[in-house]
Amino acid sequence: MELRFPRFSQGLAQDPTTRRIWFGIATAHDFESHDDITEERLYQNIFASHFGQLAIIFLWTSGNLFHVAWQGNFESWIQDPLHVRPIAHAIWDPHFGQPAVEAFTRGGAAGPVNIAYSGVYQWWYTIGLRTNEDLYTGALFLLFLSTLSLIGGWLHLQPKWKPSLSWFKNAESRLNHHLSGLFGVSSLAWTGHLVHVAIPGSSRGEYVRWNNFLDVLPYPQGLGPLLTGQWNLYAQNPDSSNHLFGTTQGAGTAILTLLGGFHPQTQSLWLTDIAHHHLAIAFIFLIAGHMYRTNFGIGHSIKDLLEAHTPPGGRLGRGHKGLYDTINNSIHFQLGLALASLGVITSLVAQHMYSLPAYAFIAQDFTTQAALYTHHQYIAGFIMTGAFAHGAIFFIRDYNPEQNEDNVLARMLDHKEAIISHLSWASLFLGFHTLGPYVHNDVMLAFGTPEKQILIEPIFAQWIQSAHGKTTYGFDILLSSTNGPTFNAGRNIWLPGWLNAVNENSNSLFLTIGPGDFLVHHAIALGLHTTTLILVKGALDARGSKLMPDKKDFGYSFPCDGPGRGGTCDISAWDAFYLAVFWMLNTIGWVTFYWHWKHITLWQGNVSQFNESSTYLMGWLRDYLWLNSSQLINGYNPFGMNSLSVWAWMFLFGHLVWATGFMFLISWRGYWQELIETLAWAHERTPLANLIRWRDKPVALSVVQARLVGLAHFSVGYIFTYAAFLIASTSGKFG
């Protein structure tokens, strides 16, 4: 018999319907479910695929460098980073007429181009790249790494080079190598680059390349202070406040500082502070990489650590006993932990990229700031929901009740009703108490009595900001109390520039907050708690619930258990994930709306618009969404087109994709099955058309698959729509 797709499942390969294709694609990466899979082969396949992932990442970043070097304007941008628009790549479109060619020819280019809103120009500039040749060199190097990764992936699939199962299960060695190798050594290497190339080359005008790399001294006395123990010398004579970035004017000689705050000209963190930070990180992680015991006999055994964690008084059962083997033998548990950590870090990156910008001049590129914040928050949302999805799969496929008797994991399952009901209460409370004031304020505005709004000052948040040095609110506490010991000690010991930065209104550090912020923070809290409720309930009920005690026998994603148990529809762990993604998107919508509107008013110098309009719903709809979409809808108008046309088209297209999602989410399997059978009947009776036959009988998607397709369209359309709105409304105002 001929081999048909999918080769990894003979059962599916023999399916006579089109289900074979869709289920084949859906389970292609679920290695655990494949025929003839063993635990060892499973680990080896995943390990080899990591090399493929790295190859794709290196190829993609290489492409960024290559296209900017080939079609961008990097060399002219660095002459005037604040006024020249950075070009991502050229556009070639045979449909372009003359008006379009003119509209998209900008940034000093000869033809139509796309503008870069990713911040790569600022990054490359800050770390010391100066010419197109530098960019080409970087692109080639990354291409080389990509090739190397592919070879590595192929090599580790060869019998001789396949790592054994015991190698994959050696958690202590892996942690040591990842901590000291991945984080420690790479942070040290980055410190080296900043000190040897970026600080002398990028910041102080001494262009460092391969040919003079060994000649340019990063510090006049070289390693002297390090070897004689006078480390404080490396912090003396920093760049002055009138330093012109990229020149020797006002430049110092310090390489590792604790200045705090921002470089007055570039509005970004001091490079010498960044180098110091990475050196500290490297030091910590190099030590941490020697923390776990391997065959050298030093350090801790993770298993011993966990077993020793017996809670005092015995009130929490057997503590962490059994956790080591549970985690070490479950890829889904490990992936869940990794995704949870990565998701949180990605969201932190979004927060810190705008509040503490690290790259020269990026803070004044408003569209890039908005795009990077939004991008990282959406990525964080998807990654965090994924963490709970794999947590649920762990409970279904990998959890062993005997191994985890009365430990923290078992006790989480034992009192899940209390956890879920408390989360439900918190979500309900936040929902009613946030929507209530918004609706009340809306009605008051509509009736012409704005003075009757419920406006609550966020005094606790303002108090926290004051403790960090913000003097606006007059709290006179800790770092905002100029007579207090904290303030005086802080001025002398650390970060003298920090307090200036906190109290300047030209950056995004500790933005002044009021009643509008108070309300939207609670709206976001509602979204976060509801998303968490759905995800936590999905994971904790994944093995079974009072309604369906045998749920784990049905697997991760099932539609229902037939008409006999009617209440079993929509309660699989997959359905919880599916519902949570809608809430996640909803929440990040509020987060990005808030961030964008507050910053637009800040950048335009009319913060009162946000303060006055953000306290009621019509304010958000009219003064944020409607007002800022006007440029967008003007991409095409009776006078022709302009450079926002592409975003206007994307805005419409995004809505179309989003709306298509509902076709899959609302009309289900029976409707489509009837339609398909009618179409197949018509096809077979139509001359010429009936010459074409298909081997598989066409059938509708399953309920779960249709939901996935609907969710994918909803998510992609939602993000496309907002991306177009965000970029067009920001670049339309600020260029």
Curated annotation (Swiss-Prot):
One GO term describing the cellular component: chloroplast thylakoid membrane
PANTHER family for this protein: OUTER MEMBRANE PROTEIN, OMPA-RELATED, PHOTOSYSTEM I P700 CHLOROPHYLL A APOPROTEIN A1-RELATED
Topology of the protein relative to the lipid bilayer: Multi-pass membrane protein
Annotated protein name in UniProt: Photosystem I P700 chlorophyll a apoprotein A2
Catalyzed reactions: reduced [plastocyanin] + hnu + oxidized [2Fe-2S]-[ferredoxin] = oxidized [plastocyanin] + reduced [2Fe-2S]-[ferredoxin]
Key word Electron transport present: yes
Assigned keywords, A-Z: 4Fe-4S, Chlorophyll, Chloroplast, Chromophore, Electron transport, Iron, Iron-sulfur, Magnesium, Membrane, Metal-binding, Oxidoreductase, Photosynthesis, Photosystem I, Plastid, Thylakoid, Transmembrane, Transmembrane helix, Transport
Pfam family, one: PsaA_PsaB
Family per record: Belongs to the PsaA/PsaB family.
EC number: 1.97.1.12
Binding site for [4Fe-4S] cluster: C560, C569
Residues bound to chlorophyll a B3: M663, Y671
Role according to the record: PsaA and PsaB bind P700, the primary electron donor of photosystem I (PSI), as well as the electron acceptors A0, A1 and FX. PSI is a plastocyanin-ferredoxin oxidoreductase, converting photonic excitation into a charge separation, which transfers an electron from the donor P700 chlorophyll pair to the spectroscopically characterized acceptors A0, A1, FX, FA and FB in turn. Oxidized P700 is reduced on the lumenal side of the thylakoid membrane by plastocyanin.
Cofactor binding mode and count: P700 is a chlorophyll a/chlorophyll a' dimer, A0 is one or more chlorophyll a, A1 is one or both phylloquinones and FX is a shared 4Fe-4S iron-sulfur center.
Enzyme class: oxidoreductase
Oligomeric form and interacting partners: The PsaA/B heterodimer binds the P700 chlorophyll special pair and subsequent electron acceptors. PSI consists of a core antenna complex that captures photons, and an electron transfer chain that converts photonic excitation into a charge separation. The eukaryotic PSI reaction center is composed of at least 11 subunits.
Positions of transmembrane segments: 46-69, 135-158, 175-199, 274-292, 331-354, 370-396, 418-440, 518-536, 576-597, 644-666, 708-728
Highest taxon in the source lineage: Eukaryota
UniProt xrefs under InterPro entries: PSI_PsaA/B (IPR001280), PSI_PsaA/B_CS (IPR020586), PSI_PsaA/B_sf (IPR036408), PSI_PsaB (IPR006244)
Subcellular location: Plastid, Chloroplast thylakoid membrane
Sites where the protein binds phylloquinone: W672
HAMAP family tied to this protein: PSI_PsaB
Gene that specifies this protein: psaB
Binding site for chlorophyll a B1: H655
GO molecular function: 4 iron, 4 sulfur cluster binding; chlorophyll binding; electron transfer activity; magnesium ion binding; oxidoreductase activity
Lineage, highest ranks first: Eukaryota, Viridiplantae, Streptophyta, Embryophyta, Tracheophyta
GO biological process: photosynthesis
Principal cellular location given in the protein's record: plastid
Organism: Zea mays (Maize)
